[in-house]
Curated annotation (Swiss-Prot):
Keywords: Nucleus, Repeat, Ribonucleoprotein, Ribosome biogenesis, rRNA processing
Protein name in UniProt: U3 small nucleolar RNA-associated protein 10
Record flagged with keyword GTP-binding: no
SUPFAM superfamilies recorded: ARM repeat
GO biological process assignments: maturation of SSU-rRNA from tricistronic rRNA transcript (SSU-rRNA, 5.8S rRNA, LSU-rRNA); positive regulation of transcription by RNA polymerase I
Originating gene: UTP10
The organism of origin for this protein: Kluyveromyces lactis (strain ATCC 8585 / CBS 2359 / DSM 70799 / NBRC 1267 / NRRL Y-1140 / WM37)
Subunit structure: Component of the ribosomal small subunit (SSU) processome.
Compositional bias (Acidic residues): 1215-1226
Protein location: Nucleus, Nucleolus
HEAT repeat start-end pairs: 1734-1772
GO cellular component: 90S preribosome; small-subunit processome; t-UTP complex
Similarity annotation: Belongs to the HEATR1/UTP10 family.
Secretion signal span: none
InterPro entries per the UniProt record, alphabetical: ARM-type_fold, BP28_C_dom, HEAT_type_2, HEAT_Utp10/HEAT1, U3snoRNP10_N, UTP10
């Protein structure tokens, strides 16, 4: 029975739509899918019904199944149906109808009629409440649509749909993660499973719904992939759902199940029983073709997940039958062909094993499956083992041959291992299958006797069973008995194969071989030839071949001595190539047996052995005996090549003819193959012997099919056979029939034959004569065009060693234009004619032209690939072909572009070959205008590029040929080619330049070469912006290099600078940078002399831009200035010059990019040249000379700047305008000067330091412009910064000049300042390595400048003096009076002044004193106080710098002087400054000094330190800082004092401590009379407490000095003479710590205890609440300290009780109770005896009027007392 809660829930659900009030009814009625609530509330049922009915009729028209609801849900009576008054049965029927409708409407929610029809059910029957689950389930797959969002807004969510709660009345649709959470609930999955069952049963599933279901289940599986327990719970549910889906007839349902099963098995491997059951379910209802493929994929995936033992066992018979019925064999093959991406080896292994077990009819077909699938090794082993077992019981064992041959072909060793595991050998198994199988034998091969023995054992075991009598066997196969004296070599292959199988069967059944042979072959001839054929048959087992050899030996013994058996030798010789050593060995024995017989002219079966009445030429008995004897004596069984033995050198012609005839007439394919291989392998084989095979070659191609059939039936490798046949064509072949045979084989339709002969040609071709070579080449070309070949004709052609003469002949035979292109009288090219055009339009001629183009393409591709050694005839032929291709292009409109490009490559290769062979030559027959015209007419950039390369290559071989076409070529390149952004175009331009330009320069026809060069430069530089950025350097460097760098760099630089100027004027800054980057990289391609010379020449060109230059008359006549410069105005020329100089400056100067690219760094290039010992001195001098010229030109440009003038405006105008113009001129000239000074700096920076100094000294010493000297001096300073110490001699030179400059009174402040800074920099760098005389002189001059009253010079002088003191040390002592007082005076002068240079000045002074402290500390003591003051008050100097100086002071100055000076500085300066930074630095120095001082010195300096300490204690009374700052200062002072105290002994510290006590209590030694006693006491007690914490019990006895004063002070607190809470707290803390750290019973002294205890405990009378806890601690500590003295305990108890009486004040009692509680908690056992006196007091306090006191006693003191006594306190109260 359901619980009460369930019953109530059911009642609530039933009454969910019962509305007793109007608002509730309105709310229920307004729930709508279509309308908003306000609109819905106004609608009546009739209106809703009418709208819904119309939509319902639309649904019926779409799907007739909706018609069933016409008389129920959508009947006219439904308007009046009220669900709330229906019976249970009626409600049940209504719910069923609604559910059926929702299942049917599910795929149609996207239709408007569906919404309006369902609207009726929601409004009338409230299905969103009563059928909410079905409504949600049927629309769940629509969760991303607006419909589902509307449903969520009105539906009452069932509990299982809680994940949708956040999306109710929300603008967002549920997410994919929400669906995963929903489906991850097992209860919901069960609900959804039931829903699926219903829709499957009702057959209302549809694709989108199934797809949604599948995806959801897959997501759930993926979501729980790492949760194996959850997956195990999902397995039964998913299997159940899959089973229901598979039971459906819908292919979509089945495919959904397939997908779910595959994913589930992948995530959680299922056991085999489940997979077998799933497979059975999948196959049980498989009808549709669409589902069949998916079913097979799924089954394969399921089986692929199996692991462990038995995973590839054969299928149960029932499952196999289902698989066989569902998937026919051909279907499985097709599946494997198309679906290789699936791994399905386990399923197909099980399937194959099932075929082996149940379905033997398919055994012969399983090879097809095996060929299409890759199996694991263990799977192959299982299959092989099953097949071996099957071979024991299978009647028709021939079905197994194909499959075993396949396994042996892929892994013969594995098959043999499987046989060995079953105690079988390969030979026995071959007999069992009646065929030859194994080809690869192990080194430990069994001998013939062993094989026969094993075979006999197998026979014996077979004979033990029920064997058929031989007579019955013979009767059964009597039709195959041979009674004629015939050669069995000639019988048909079918009959022989059958006889062979009978022989194998007879042997395997245990019949004697001789019995079989004598019974089935009644004549000796047929028996011998039969065993002979078996011996050389690849299809016969090895064991059978051995038996046949044994029988042959027996048969030979039965032949009369007069019969010569040499006729059998050729076949036996081929048996010597058998893979089995045993066969070869036994064959040799048979040959030895024949050799022992007499050699007569009566040959055995001489005319019938190879054919009826076929007489084969034989050797004479003498020759045959000689041959056989020598052969056997030389033959070794292990030999693999016996060709040299077959054809001995003696009488080789006789033997060659004999063996050639034998090879020709041998009817057996295997023997013929062996024989041909032996013959064609010997060197004697030549075209004379190939004549023997003329008829064979003539008929071979027509008879090829029959030979192929023979090879297949006899298991002979047909490819080996055909290779041997193709080898008949001999090296140096002259026979035309043989060449025809070769060509026919190539052109045959048989791919194998064509490819074999194509390979054969490669070795034959070099040995043939020219006509035959030409014939073969021409036939390959013709056949490649005329028909589709079975081999790659082009590849074969390109593999042949063709010569230039072959190509010339082929090209001549395939030409179109019959005109003689080499006729020199024809100076113009042949033009396209109308006749040619009209002719080529005809179809037949057009086809011929296309074929001709194909031939030409093949020829050209071959020529391009081979790169033959060329001659002039070939070049002429190629030019003729170029004309032909133009004809085909222009007249015929054929696609000749590829052929033209290939021809261009061939022309390049040909010219290159001619050049390497003959060098320069004259080619009068070559027409360059053909090339130029082809270049112009071609529309392909690649074609144009290649033809340009041809022009260039031709120029290098025959310059005269192309010189008259130079300008058109370069014009074309500038306009088109260099704009192509590809490697090939760039290579083309570079190569063309490098070939044509030298020819141009060498030509005698060019008179004014400079004009030509400048024209070329302008042509190429104009196209600069169009050249791809990354191609520019390579292209232009090639051009300049070929034109001559020394003459061309400057004009080219001028042209580029002009474009740079244009960019600047147009504000294209980024583009202008590209020019600088380019030219830096460009210059790196040339040596340094060429670069410097180029810059110098550029200056000459820039000078031509000056209006007043003497050279400017030359400018208009130069080609270089023809591009607009001549027409420029003066102002434009000035701008151009300025920008040109700016360009030079940026090219010479270093940039960030030069750091990563050293090749473009001009400075580094110069340095490497000057410092390289391998470079000649002459070259270095040339570099220096070029640099001096560059420097002089730079300085000259600077000097000339002032004389430049120009007029930007018209001369007419007002004075104001003229003034404005002059102002602009000044600005421009200033800009030009700045550029030149920057250029000068960069130029000077190029040289090494020695050369640099030599260059600038004359400038610094002379009457050079001040700004020039200023820049030079700055550059000098920077130059020396990174120079090595070895450059000090050079530094002396420059220093001498700089010192002289500082002595000149006429020098400006700017020059003096930069000079002093440079001196400082040089001295810092080289120090004492410099000349001491110069250093002293520098010091004198700096001291003079120190008094100049100019702050700039004072700073620079101080800097120089600092570096000099650092360098010279004590040697500077004589200048002390001139430095220190002056520096102090300067500091004081500017201390309170406002100046921008104040920071630098203070820093310079601080650093000056720092250097003195470091180098001459003892001499600075007289001014140490001033140094400290300056240090503390240099506010503009960084604190880190001043702290570093403090460290130097402590390190170098004697500490006694430091302490004394600190005491003075504090008293006289710092204490009165109110400078917090100064105080902080003072304390830092004091702390550093205290930490650094040793104990001995500390003892000596202790009076000084403690005087300073007392001064620091007094600081709080005079400073203006806030309380927190004062406390931090005092904390630092206490910490420093404690560190100092730790370095003193007791003897020293006691009097000092007494001194401090007297200072605090008596005011002795107080320097500040304004400081009150309370302030002193607070400072003292803080110090004492800090010291007590550090020294603990060591200074407990020191309390004697302050015992009485402290007692008095406590009494003053009681009497309120002194009221200071902070002081009282400090006193209590000091007492507490003293009691706490007492280890010497100091406070157990009665006198001290009595003195202090009363005063301390009496503090309870008026202690402030904020410090009450400190008093409690002090009393508790005193009690703890005296706990062992009963008398003292009694005294304390009495004193405490006196403050706990009822008459006492409330707070007094409260703190007394607290104190007593602490005492008992710490020393309760010692005070138990005193408890009786306390009990009445406690009893009174428990009834105290003050609740806080009463509560403290009850909850505090009583509890503590009880814990001490161990019993309740109530007993004492009663």
């Amino acid at each position: 029975m359901s619980s009460l809660r369930d019953q109530l829930a059911q009642v609530a659900q039933n009454n969910a739509t019962v509305a007793l009030d109007r608002k509730r009814r309105q709310k229920l009625h307004s729930a709508s899918l279509v309308y908003n609530p306000k609109t819905a509330a106004t609608q009546d049922y009739e209106y809703i019904y009418d709208t819904a009915l119309e939509s319902f009729h639309t649904l019926v028209s779409l799907d007739l199944r909706f018609k069933v609801f016409t008389n129920s849900l959508f009947s006219a009576s439904s308007v009046t149906i009220d669900r709330n008054v229906q019976t249970k049965d009626q409600i049940r029927d209504l719910d069923n109808a609604v559910n059926a409708y929702l299942m049917l409407i599910s795929p149609k929610w996207h239709l408007t009629p569906a919404l309006h029809a369902t609207e009726w059910l929601i409004r009338r029957f409230q299905i969103h409440i009563h059928n909410a689950e079905m409504l949600l389930l049927s629309t769940l797959n629509q969760y991303q649509t607006p419909v589902f969002k509307r449903i969520l807004n009105i539906v009452k969510l069932p509990p299982l749909f809680n994940p949708f709660t956040n999306f109710v009345r929300n603008d967002k649709n549920p997410t994919d993660l929400t669906l995963i959470k929903l489906f991850n609930d097992m209860d919901f999955l069960k609900l959804y499973s039931n829903y699926l069952s219903k829709i499957i049963k009702q057959k209302v599933t549809y694709t989108n719904q199934l797809l949604f279901t599948t995806c959801c289940f897959i997501n759930v599986i993926a979501f729980n992939a790492n949760d194996e327990d959850k997956l195990n719970k999902l397995v039964p549910l998913i299997l159940e759902i899959s089973a229901k889906l598979l039971a459906s007839d819908s292919s979509d349902c089945q495919m959904a199940a397939h997908t779910m099963l595959a994913v589930l098995a992948t995530a959680l491997p299922l056991n085999k029983s489940i997979i077998i059951a799933a497979t059975e379910t999948i196959l049980a209802n498989l009808k549709e073709d669409d589902a069949r493929k998916k079913a097979l994929v799924t089954i394969s995936k399921l089986f692929q997940t199996l692991k462990g033992v038995g995973n590839v066992d054969q299928l149960p018979v029932k499952i196999y039958k289902l698989v066989d019925n569902s998937f026919p064999f051909e279907y499985l093959l097709q599946f494997l062909s198309n679906e290789n991406k699936y791994s399905s080896d386990k399923f197909f292994t099980a399937y194959i094993r099932s075929v082996i077990r149940y379905d033997h009819d398919k055994l012969s077909q399983i090879v097809k499956i095996l060929r299409k699938i890759k199996l694991e090794k263990y799977e192959v082993r299982f299959i092989i083992t099953d097949l071996i077992h099957l071979s024991e019981v299978l009647e028709d064992k021939s079905q197994l041959i194909d499959v075993f041959e396949y396994f042996i072909s892929i892994n013969e060793g594995l098959v043999l291992k499987c046989l060995q595991a079953l105690n079988l050998t390969g030979e026995v198994f071959e007999i069992r299958l009646t065929t030859s199988l194994f080809s690869v034998k192990n080194s430990a091969e069994q001998s013939g006797e062993d094989i026969i023995k094993v075979l006999d054992d197998a026979k014996a075991s077979t004979a033990n069973g029920s064997a058929v009598p031989f007579k019955d066997f013979m009767t059964k196969n009597s039709e195959f008995i041979s009674t004629k004296a015939e050669s069995m070599l000639l019988v048909k292959d079918e009959k022989f194969v059958k006889l062979l199988s009978l022989f194998v069967e007879a042997v395997s059944k245990g019949y004697q071989p001789g019995l079989f042979l004598s019974s089935f072959f009644t004549t000796l001839e047929s028996r011998i030839t039969f065993v002979l054929r078996i011996i050389v048959s690849p299809g016969s087992p090895v064991a059978l071949r051995l038996i046949s050899l044994t029988q042959l030996s027996k048969f030979i013994n039965g032949i009369d001595e007069q019969t010569d058996l040499f006729s059998l030798v050729p076949i036996l010789v081929t048996a010597l190539m058998d893979i089995s050593r045993s066969v070869r060995s036994n064959t040799k024995k048979v040959l030895q047996q024949i050799a022992k017989r007499p050699f007569t002219a009566k040959y055995f079966l001489s005319n019938v052995l190879y054919g009826e009445n076929l007489k084969v030429p034989m050797l004479s008995p003498k020759d045959s005996k000689f041959w056989l004897t020598n052969f056997l004596s030389d033959y070794i069984v292990e030999s693999t090549d016996i060709s040299s033995l077959v054809i001995p050198s003696k009488n080789d012609m006789v033997y060659m003819l004999f063996w050639c005839n034998q090879a020709l007439h041998l009817p057996l394919a295997y023997s013929k193959t062996i024989m041909l291989k032996l013959l064609t392998a010997v060197p004697q084989y030549a075209f004379t012997y190939s004549k023997v095979f003329e008829q064979f070659m003539a008929t071979y191609i027509t008879e090829r099919s029959s030979w192929e059939t023979k090879c297949i039936k006899n298991k002979t490798n047909f490819k080996d056979f055909e290779t041997a046949v193709c080898a008949i064509v001999a090296p140096k072949e002259k026979n035309s029939f043989a060449i025809d045979f070769l060509i026919n084989c190539l052109e045959s339709e048989y791919e194998q034959l064509s490819n074999i002969m194509a390979d054969r040609i490669l070795s034959l071709y070099p040995t043939l004569k020219f006509p035959n070579q030409l014939k073969i080449v021409q036939s390959i070309i013709d056949s490649s065009v005329d028909k589709e070949l079975s081999y790659d004709g082009l590849e074969t052609l390109q593999s042949l060693p063709l010569t230039a003469d072959i190509f010339v002949s082929v090209l001549k035979s395939n030409t179109i234009n019959s005109e003689d292109q080499t006729d020199l009288t024809k100076r113009r090219r042949r033009r396209s004619s109308t006749v040619n055009k009209s002719a080529l339009q005809k179809q037949d001629i057009s086809q011929i032209a296309e074929a001709h183009l194909k031939k030409m393409t093949i020829i050209l591709e071959t020529l391009d690939k081979l790169k033959v050694k060329s001659n002039e005839n070939l070049l002429n032929a190629l030019f003729n072909l170029l004309s032909d291709l133009e004809t085909l292009d222009h007249d015929g409109g054929l696609p000749v572009l590829y052929a033209q490009e290939t021809l261009s490559s061939c022309l390049l290769n040909t010219i290159s070959s001619l050049k390497s062979n003959n060098g320069s030559m004259k080619l009068p027959s070559i027409r360059a205008d053909i090339l130029v015209a082809a270049i112009r007419s071609s529309t392909s950039p690649q074609m144009q590029n290649k033809l340009l390369l041809v022009v260039g290559a031709l120029a290098s071989v025959s310059p005269e040929t192309i010189l008259h076409s130079v300008m058109p070529i370069f014009t074309f390149m500038g306009a088109h080619t260099i704009r192509q952004d590809d490697e090939f175009s760039t290579l083309v331009v570079e190569r063309t330049i490098s070939t044509i330009v030298p020819a141009l320069l060498k030509s005698t026809e060019v008179t004014n070469k400079s004009d030509e060069i400048e024209f070329l430069l302008m042509s190429f530089s104009t196209a600069f912006s169009h050249v791809p950025k990354h191609r520019r350097v390579s292209l232009y460097s090639t051009l300049v290099r070929e034109l001559g760098p020394s003459d061309v760099i400057a004009p080219f630089l001028f042209l580029i600078a002009q474009q740079y100027s244009n960019c600047l004027e147009k504000f294209k800054i980024a583009e202008s940078k590209n020019y600088i980057e380019f030219f830096k990289a460009f210059l790196s391609k040339f040596d340094i002399l060429e670069q410097l010379h180029g810059f110098n020449e550029l200056f000459n060109l820039v000078e031509l831009l000056d209006e007043d230059s003497s050279k400017n008359e030359v400018a208009p006549t130069r080609t270089l200035f023809s591009n607009g410069i001549v027409n420029m105005s003066k102002s434009e020329l000035f701008v151009l010059k300025k920008n040109d100089l700016d360009f030079i400056d940026k090219v010479i100067g270093e940039s960030k990019s030069d750091y990563y690219n050293t090749s473009s760094n001009l400075k580094l290039r110069i340095l490497s040249t000057l410092l390289d010992p391998n470079i000649e001195i002459e070259v270095k001098n040339q570099v220096r000379n070029e640099f001096s010229i560059l420097l002089s030109k730079t300085l000259n440009a600077i000097n000339m700047t002032d004389s430049l003038s120009y007029d930007k405006h018209s001369s007419a105008g007002s004075n104001d305008e003229e003034a404005g113009s002059e102002s602009e001129a000044e600005v421009d000239q200033k800009e030009l000067k700045d550029i030149l000074f920057g250029l000068l700096e960069h130029v000077l920076d190029l040289l090494p330091i020695q050369d640099f100094v030599a260059s600038i000294l004359p400038l610094l010493q002379g009457n050079t412009d001040e700004s020039v000297r200023h820049h030079l001096t700055v550059v000098t300073s920077n130059k020396f910064i990174e120079e090595p110490m070895e450059s000090f001699e050079t530094a002396n030179e420059i220093l001498s000049t700089l010192v002289e400059t500082t002595e000149k009174a006429s020098e400006s402040t700017q020059i003096l300042q930069v000079t002093l800074n440079t001196i400082s920099s040089i001295v810092t760098r080289f120090g004492d390595r410099l000349d001491s005389h110069l250093l002293v002189k520098s010091m004198e001059n700096s001291c003079k400048q120190l008094t100049s009253k100019k702050i700039e010079l004072e700073i620079s002088s101080l800097t120089v003096l600092t570096t000099l003191i650092q360098t010279l040390g004590v040697k500077t002592l004589a200048f002390y009076p001139k430095i220190v007082p002056v520096a102090i005076s300067i500091f004081k002068t500017y201390q309170n002044a406002k100046n921008n240079l104040k920071e630098q000045l203070q820093l310079a002074i601080v650093l000056l004193f720092a250097s003195m402290i470091k180098k001459i500390p003892s001499f600075l003591l007289s001014n140490l106080q001033d140094v400290f003051v300056i240090l503390f008050h240099s506010d503009e100097v960084a604190d880190s710098v001043r702290l570093s100086v403090i460290s130097l002071i402590v390190e170098h100055i004697p500490l006694k002087d430091v302490f004394k000076t600190l005491q003075k500085v504090w008293t006289n300066d710092v204490s009165s400054s109110n400078n917090s930074v100064a105080v902080s630095l003072f304390l830092s120095m004091l702390e550093s000094a205290v930490e650094a001082i040793d104990k001995k010195s500390a003892t000596q300096q202790s009076p000084v330190f403690f005087r300073l300490l007392l001064n620091l204690f007094e600081y709080r009374s005079i400073c203006t800082f806030d309380e927190n700052s004062i406390n931090r200062i005092e904390a630092s002072v206490h910490q420093i004092a404690n560190v100092y105290v730790l370095k003193l002994n007791d003897k020293v510290f006691r009097p000092l401590f007494a001194l401090v006590v007297n200072w605090a209590f008596n005011g002795e030694g107080v320097t500040n009379t304004n400081m009150s006693k309370e302030e002193r006491l607070m400072a003292f007690y803080k110090f004492y407490n800090k010291t007590q914490e550090n020294l603990k019990s060591i200074i407990t006895s020191y309390f004697t000095y302050l015992l009485e004063p402290t007692n008095n002070l406590l009494k003053q607190f009681i009497s309120k003479e002194t009221v200071n809470v902070s002081l009282r707290r400090l006193v209590l803390i000091s007492l507490t710590s003293s009691f706490k750290y007492d280890r010497d019973e100091y406070w157990k002294s009665t006198s001290r205890f009595e003195l202090i205890s009363e005063s301390l405990i009496n503090q309870l009378t008026n202690v402030e609440d904020v410090i009450g806890k400190y008093l409690v601690k002090a009393i508790g500590s005193l009690a703890t300290n005296n706990s062992g003295v009963d008398e003292h305990n009694k005294i304390m108890s009495d004193l405490m009780i006196s403050h706990m009486k009822t008459s006492c004040k409330t707070r007094e009692k409260f703190w007394a109770v607290r104190s007593m509680k602490l005492i008992y908690s710490k020393v309760g056992d010692g005070w138990l005896v005193l408890l009786p006196r306390l009990v009445p007091i406690i009893a009174e306090l428990l009834e105290d009027e003050d609740e806080e006191v009463e509560y403290e006693v009850r909850s505090g003191l009583v509890k503590v007392v009880e814990s001490v006594m161990g019993e309740p306190f109530d007993r004492y109260l009663s």
